[in-house]
Amino acid sequence: MLVSLALDSYPAEVLSRPSLPAQRFAVTLLSAAQKMLAGRFAAEGRPSARLALDDVPHVRGSLSGALIPSEGLAALECSVARRVPAGDHLLVIASVIGVPYTAETGDPLIRFRGRYPVL
């Protein structure tokens, strides 16, 4: 998997840390019904993941130790293979080491040009 992150973003800061536990993280594919949750994580000065997920059902990934919302379309636990600076972004190349869940139905949350279009 490849993730492209703005260098000045909180996720880039976290994934750049050499102390990241076992160099592992999780990605949740959110459903169209989870715009509010996406907004919490996208906001500047946002609280920690633990606080952002305070009123949202979640689990701790067994392989990554990351907090994972329970109601997305899918969750992936990943291990960092390589970090590549690319202009004003950081590319994180990772191996998927686990798939805690996938949903049977649901529409994905997509952000395009600052909006959430419906497919």
Report residues per predicted region.
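Basic, polyanion-binding surface patches
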Residues: 1-119
